[in-house]
Curated annotation (Swiss-Prot):
Taxonomic lineage of the native organism: Bacteria, Bacillati, Actinomycetota, Actinomycetes, Mycobacteriales
DNA-binding region(s) from the entry: 158-255
Name of the protein described by the UniProt record: Transcriptional regulatory protein TrcR
GO biological process terms, semicolon-separated: regulation of DNA-templated transcription
Species the sequence originates in: Mycobacterium tuberculosis (strain ATCC 25618 / H37Rv)
Pfam families linked to this entry: Response_reg, Trans_reg_C
UniProt gene name: trcR
Keyword Transport: no
């Protein structure tokens, strides 16, 4: 078993123990997104490699300010967070995250190992707490457990979504904004559902094309722009905009400030 200290070196990341378990992925089939926050490059490199074995995408932040910025950008499915960081500590990062996001499962991975440290971490909003040194196998197993219990990953077709005053009911296929019904075509509905499943996250045209159209229009990302324009006319007309262009990337849906 591979055991890691704060700045460990390991011959190999986890392989045999978890290698036979089924892969976990997002409801739309895309990879799990992990935000890993730690200021020790040796540790983040090895953990990132281990999570890549799971088929997950890993974004790394080395300080608190970077973590806060990347959280909104990445929209992670799980957050792995050190407490002792050079600027904003992990407890404060989680406090800020929980102000707007109460669902993303979070695991503290830290050298602070007293009982009081654990209690403080868990009562601050974390879902799990591991201390250094640690095993990569156990870390991966704990993250898999958090993800299995995370309701936003197993989204049924009849799910109900809400972002600000915008609601979408998958069962009745009804959409409202501020209580006003909005009529959408089937494609518009699926596009809006994908945007609402990823609020505050910059989504590329290619990713949207892949998830909504399944490459039926391969290479024609202009179809995304066309349907975004349709949605804007229906969702944002005479209201504060929720669908925003992210220059150089694509689009983001976020509630009015």
């Amino acid at each position: 078993m591979t055991t890691m200290s704060g700045y460990t070196r390991s011959q190999r990341p986890r392989q045999a123990i978890l290698g036979q378990l089924p892969r976990i992925h997002r409801a739309d089939g895309s990879p799990i997104r992990v935000l890993l926050v730690d200021d020790e490059p040796a540790l983040t490199n090895l953990v990132k490699m281990a999570l890549h074995y799971e088929g997950w995408d890993v974004e790394v932040a080395h300080d608190g300010q970077e973590a806060i910025a990347k959280f909104d950008k990445v929209g992670p499915d799980v957050l792995v967070l050190d407490i002792m960081l050079p600027d904003v500590d992990g407890l404060e990062i989680l406090r800020r995250v929980r102000e707007s996001d109460v669902y993303t499962p979070t695991l503290f991975l830290t050298a602070r190992d007293s009982v009081m440290d654990r209690v403080t971490g868990l009562t601050s909003g974390a879902d799990d707490y591991m201390t250094k040194p640690f095993s990569l196998e156990e870390l991966v197993a704990r993250l898999r457990g958090l993800l299995r219990r995370s309701s936003h990953l197993e989204r049924p077709a009849d799910e109900a979504l809400r972002v600000g005053d915008l609601t979408l009911d998958g069962a009745s296929r009804e959409v409202t904004r501020d209580g006003t019904p909005i009529s959408l075509s089937s494609t518009e509905f699926e596009l809006l559902r994908f945007l609402m499943r990823n609020p505050r996250r910059a989504l590329s045209r290619t990713e949207i094309l892949d998830r909504v159209w399944n490459y039926d229009f391969a290479g024609r990302t202009s179809i995304v722009d066309l349907y975004i324009s349709y949605l804007r006319k229906k969702i944002d007309s005479d209201r504060e905009p929720m669908i925003h262009t992210v220059r150089g990337i694509g689009y983001m849906l976020r509630p009015p400030e």
